UniProtKB/Swiss-Prot annotation:
Official protein name in the record: ATP phosphoribosyltransferase regulatory subunit
The keyword Cytoplasm belongs to this UniProt entry's keyword annotation: yes
Localization: Cytoplasm
Segments forming a coiled coil: none
Length: 420
């Protein structure tokens, strides 16, 4: 229908925008406290940038008609664009780079036969140019602090789960499976589909391995104990030890409102550029689990845009603003209305128009008030009072051209803009 937004998109009305800005401002405050600086990249990018050397499928990009030889598309995520900007526009900058973003991303409207939201809003950080366990722990703590700033970890929201995997370790553990079955095994493990694992045409030893990999999720000590039942290669042992160091470092430095770290070695991201830890924040609701944020380490992505980057590492995460908004709204943590207007300025007649405009500007600039100018021709006091009550305006200011403004209070039932 011509008067409706496209499938998978929606209008954000003033109340929606107020709630979205409430979330974004708190996330931004935490990002800045950790030393991250905002970056804004183009909504429209070259397709070669967006597919990240093949790590992002072209089918995941909404492509647009263009005279560009490589084609153009709408970004399905921010990491590739920021990596491209880092190795071109920020080349030579002092490392590490700490960047954050507040932006929209775009996905195809249909995933298989299922309609999904086409335009999404995200907030996130990227830490570029440094690897290691300490950098991983920093990013996890930035995420934990951001959630705490929104009220997670305290009533009425309660706890959340930080689930961490290791992409390189998981890929390596899947290598013994036949190539034609490896992806099926991976998908079954990721979807907790034990029945499929038991039905795949695998030798008994490989079936036992698949079932063990299926169970590599939960408390870290339990996962590490199960992992030791496998004969690990030197690389796998190194990755296992590095993951154990991260768990110890994160838990030792976690605050009282932070969620204990859980492990899930079946956790893989839909974008295939991750090379180290991958993680997501899961929050349980009466309707099921919601993923509020996700991210991971990508130590070869920057090489795609500059071969001279020589393995420059990176790690980051993105928060799903829509999911956060739904969870916070259900917990009564968000503003229910846009901010109320403080004063309504009414010219008593046409000769007072100039004086009314001047008074409105004085209140805005000098007193830092939210001011609305009354534009209706019906200026009867009872009509103006009713108008102010409907719009939750606290005071009325009558302005005439030859005398001082006269102010009176309005009986407004509720002017609170948030329950927080």
């Amino acid at each position: 229908m011509v008067h409706q937004p496209p499938a998978g998109t929606r209008d954000l009305l003033p109340q929606d925008v107020t709630q979205k800005r409430w979330i974004e401002s708190r996330l931004q405050q935490v990002f800045q406290q950790w030393g991250y600086q905002r970056i804004i990249t183009p909504t429209l990018e070259r397709l070669d940038t967006l597919v990240a050397g093949g790590a992002v499928q072209r089918s995941a990009v909404i492509q647009v008609q263009s005279d560009e030889e490589s084609g153009l598309g709408l970004r399905p995520e921010l990491t590739a664009s920021i990596a491209r900007a880092a190795v071109t526009r920020l080349a030579g900058s002092s490392l590490p780079l700490r960047l954050y973003y507040l932006a929209n991303v775009f996905r195809p409207a249909f995933q298989g036969d299922r309609l999904q939201q086409r335009e999404l809003f995200q907030a996130g950080v990227e830490l570029l140019g440094v690897g290691g366990t300490l950098a991983d722990a920093e990013v996890l703590h930035v995420l934990a602090d951001a959630l705490a700033e929104l009220g997670f970890g305290q009533p009425p929201l309660g706890s959340w789960h930080l689930v961490v995997g290791e992409a390189s370790l998981t890929r390596s553990l899947l290598q013994p499976f036949p190539k034609d079955l490896r992806e099926k095994v991976r998908q079954a493990i990721a979807q907790l589909d034990r029945v499929t694992l038991e039905s795949l045409p695998l030798e008994s030893q490989l079936r036992d391995r698949a079932l063990l990999l299926h169970d590599l999720r939960g408390q870290p000590d339990q996962v590490f104990a199960k992992l030791q039942q496998l004969t690990l290669t030197p690389l796998e042992q190194t990755l296992r030890d590095r993951l154990a160091q991260l768990v110890e470092l994160y838990n030792a430095s976690a605050g009282p409102q932070d969620s204990p770290l859980l492990l899930d070695l079946s956790l893989l991201r839909s974008f295939d550029y991750y090379t180290g830890i991958v993680f997501e924040v899961v929050y349980e609701t009466p309707t099921g689990p919601w993923v509020l944020a996700q991210g991971g380490r990508y130590d070869r992505l920057l090489d795609v845009y500059d071969p001279q980057a020589a393995g420059q590492p990176g790690i980051g995460f993105s928060c799903n603003i829509e999911n956060l908004q739904q969870v916070l709204l259900a917990a009564n943590r968000l503003p229910h209305r846009p901010p109320a207007i403080d004063q309504l300025v009414i010219p008593v007649d046409s000769e007072a128009y100039g004086a009314a405009l001047a008074e409105a500007q004085r209140l805005q600039r000098q007193d830092q008030l939210r001011v609305e100018l009354y534009l209706d021709s019906d200026r009867r006091p009872e009509v103006v009072q009713a108008f102010a009550q409907r719009r939750r305006i606290g005071r009325i200011v009558w302005v005439s051209s030859g005398s001082a403004p006269q102010s009176e209070a309005v009986a407004v039932a509720e002017r609170a803009t948030t329950t927080c």
